[in-house]
Amino acid sequence: MYKRQARTTRTYAAGLALMQFIWVVWALLGQPGGSGLLVALLLLEVFVPPLAERHGATPWHPEHMAERYSLMTIIVLGEVLLSTTGAISVILDEGTLSGQLIMTVIGGLLIVFCLWWFYFKHSHAQRLEEDGARPAFVWGYGHYLLYAAIAAVGAGLGVCIDVLEHVAHVSSRAATLSLGVPVAVALVLMGFLHARDVASWEWAVRAGGTAGAVLIVALAGWEPGLSVLLIGLVLVASLVLYLVGTDPSLAEQPHGPTDRLTSAEAPNG
């Protein structure tokens, strides 16, 4: 066991040291190759851990890893709220609040809260513990794309607000697509990150259907405020339908926990 782990750690050390050397040389040479070489070097570096783990998995803590990634997700979602509220505060200072802006704020809040719920609806720690280290790389690297998609949601909300304030000169369809596309991508990625058995793959399909509905709203070309609100309502509807369809207790316990009392436990008189 320890021999395998020793080989793994040596591969880690050699691979990461080599990549650091390449990064330094690339920087000293004036970053030749531009963005293309940058992406290639990034891919090489993220390939080092999977290559090293082929010799034997190092000890790791699934719950801790899930917590770290989850906290980063919350931070990115918080940045979306921060950017939106910052833009709205400027508008309030200028005294130009309108119905479209109010719908944008409400829709933006619904989108953020629903994305939070979609991400935390399953236990990531349980999946990591049951699947092992190798699938965890796919799960972990998949978060890179998820973080980018969530950050793009904040940018899309900013574009919609700028269009309503006549700061950004793009069409309503372009503005809502700048929001709808990253929301749809985030939904698909969350469905993929959760998918590990039949039940969760069903959820992944549901997430894909919700993403399709979001894109339809974005393509409709309505005013940005209305579109943002409708996208938020689409997510809420998907959430409610999921809860009603998968949680029988919502219908089976209309009178609270006292319905489960047996005759022996029921109070006399």
Predicted features, each with a name:
Residues 229-235:
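Signature aromatic-anchored transmembrane alpha helix within multi-pass, membrane-resident enzymes
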Residues 3-36, 43-215, 221, 235-260:
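Predominantly late transmembrane helices and immediately cytosolic-facing juxtamembrane segments
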Residues 257-269:
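Long, low-complexity, intrinsically disordered cytosolic termini of multi-pass membrane proteins
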Residues 1-3, 268-269:
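Accessible peptide chain termini
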Residues 222-229:
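Hydrophobic alpha-helical transmembrane segments of integral membrane proteins
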